[in-house]
Design a protein with these regions (language model features):
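Catalytic beta-strand/loop cores that center a nucleophilic Ser/Cys/Thr
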Residues: 36-81
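Cysteine-nucleophile active-site neighborhood
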Residues: 1-40
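Short, acidic Gly/Pro/Ser/Thr-rich loop/turn segments
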Residues: 21-24, 52-55, 91-95
Length: 142
């Protein structure tokens, strides 16, 4: 994600988007729970990095638990013009089946708006997401 911004530690990056990144002397290592306007379910993932994102006007997620783009911020990731960038590792799409469905729909409909997507069962992935939420974030399970 960092490469697509304006700069990394004041060195030029690709400058596709207006954000910049700064390397830090500390590491951010934590489990994270996020929300997004794109889907109703929670996003789960894991952070392991030593940089922060600055000047983010188009966040992808809102942090519920865990670190956002920086330790003092609740915004995380970046989305604009069909670009989705995040610091989360996970694997993100496998651990979040509703976000996977959203992402695949967006990807396909961007190129072929009339394409009919065949329904695919993600029952095991959905069960894994529910179990993780129940085991680690039970206060957010309805």
């Amino acid at each position: 994600m960092e490469l697509f911004g304006h700069s990394i530690d004041h060195e030029p990056a690709l400058n596709i988007f207006s954000y910049s990144t700064k390397k830090e002397t500390y590491r951010i290592v934590d489990e994270a729970l996020y929300k997004t306007n794109s889907i109703s379910s929670y996003i789960i993932g894991f952070n392991n990095r030593n940089s922060i994102l600055l000047n983010n006007e188009h966040p992808l997620f809102q942090s519920i638990k865990g670190v956002g783009n920086s330790p003092k911020e609740t915004k995380e990731g970046y989305t604009e013009y069909h670009f989705y960038g995040t610091y989360l590792v996970g694997p993100l799409l496998v651990r979040n089946p509703d976000f996977l469905k959203f992402f695949v729909r967006e990807l396909i409909h961007f190129k072929q708006p009339d394409f009919k997507i065949k329904k695919v069962s993600l029952k095991l992935e959905e069960q894994a997401h529910q179990e993780f939420m129940k085991n680690y974030y039970s206060e957010y399970v309805v």
